[in-house]
Amino acid sequence: MEEFQRYIELDRSWQHNFFYPLIFQEYIYGFAYDHGLNKSILLENAGDKKYSLLIVKRLINRMYQQTHLIISANHSNQNDFFGHKHKKNLYYQIISEGFAVIVEIPFSLLLISSLEAKEKKIVKSHNLRSIHSIFPFFEDKFLHLNYVLEILIPYPIHLEILVQTLRYWVKDASSLHLLRFFLYEYRNWNSLITPQKSISIFSNQRLFLFLYNFYVCEYESIFVFLCNQSSHLRSTSFGALLERNYFYGKLEYLVKVKTNTKDFCVILWLFKDPFLHYVRYRGKSILASKGTSLLMHKWKYYLFNFWQCHFSLWSPPRRIYINRLSKHSLDFMGFFSSVRLNSSVVRSQMVENSFLIDNPIKKFDTIVRIIPLVGSLAKAKFCNVLGHPISKSVWTDLLDSDIIDRFGRICRNLSHYYSGSSRKKSLYRIKYILRLSCARTLARKHKSTVRAFLKRLGSEFLEEFFTEEEKVLSLILPRDSSISRGLYRGPFWYLDIICIHDLANDE
């Protein structure tokens, strides 16, 4: 965003969310396509103001004519690899990627101003950026709650509804018409939630991810507003980009549809709950409450009606589950999380009489989802579907040090991410698969046996699979000491992780 603030000089006619003229500035496409494409197709001497109307006009004409463009000799082989279908849509991709950059500008500027206004009120903490900060929150709050609502955010939303919602932010009709053209040209809305393992340079993921995030923001804006109004503890950390007139209009319409009354307090009374917590990561969200099952069914009914009335989106019942925390495990971010009771027996002696006191203690437990993780390892060709390690044949052409470094890096990343697991047995199995797969890969390369290869390398081979923390602990504390066992076996959350590690991305 800082790059845009240096380059973009908007005059007064552009400052009220009129961003259509930016489409004709060449550096927008340079920012959007700084990887993969040759920028020479967008470079032309367009004067001091860098307007390039002729270039964009040519791109639009070629897009309608469905002709083919050879970018340069350096990229010709790459284009042939993607084939005729991707060449056909190259011009659309160039303009859509530039438009994705442009449409993010008003939201980025409002977000920056919102954060600057809150700097004095909210203490900054880089640890809150970590996705692992969710689990300490679970450990602190979920022990006192009863029910949880597991929500899979429905999709796809109707494209026209999305454009109508976006027009309250982007008031330039020309830009909205162009957006509508992009959406109806590419109807791959279903691919938003499912991550793609390999995204080509001809995909418009940036535009669709922006639209999906905008859709989720619209859904959460009203949802969090109701939570704040119905809770005794108001949220101060939620920052949403809201257009207030439109926002309260939506609320009044929702009340009218649901209760046939103008009294807004009625709908707030239905969801009165002093202990309500909401967490979301990607397309899955969790709503936990200390209330009763009846209250959770009210929230479920509200969400169904909200999606249907506001987004014209019907959500199947199986996308929302109501579960009791004491009897159900949460499947969230690669962990099975649950609240279990640990019995603590205390012997009490009073004069001549003695008796036992059983004190049940609640504990938040997290377990690694071993079956999906083994499936990911099998898909990446580290083992078979049963979890038996196999050699990584595509890496046999690499140097021994590179092979060991790749396996060690994946093992350390997994250990880093799943270090918060309460039970390490599953994590040890994953480490075993990677170590033996590495040994078999090296043995296959040198046409030797695994036993002979491990005997030649010795303990130095295993050290590559240790994390830095494990290496330090092994030097400071003996492995069989009680303190060391507690550090190795207990959960430990790293607050520097901002995304889930992808096994397929081994580079």
Swiss-Prot record:
Chief location category: plastid
GO aspect biological process, one term: mRNA processing
Keyword tRNA processing: yes
GO CC entries: chloroplast
The UniProt record lists the keyword Cell wall biogenesis/degradation: no
Protein's name according to its UniProt entry: Maturase K
Gene name per UniProt: matK
Molecular function GO labels: RNA binding
Keywords recorded for this protein, A-Z: Chloroplast, mRNA processing, Plastid, RNA-binding, tRNA processing
Positions in coiled-coil regions: none
Subcellular locations according to the entry: Plastid, Chloroplast
Annotated family: Belongs to the intron maturase 2 family. MatK subfamily.
Function: Usually encoded in the trnK tRNA gene intron. Probably assists in splicing its own and other chloroplast group II introns.
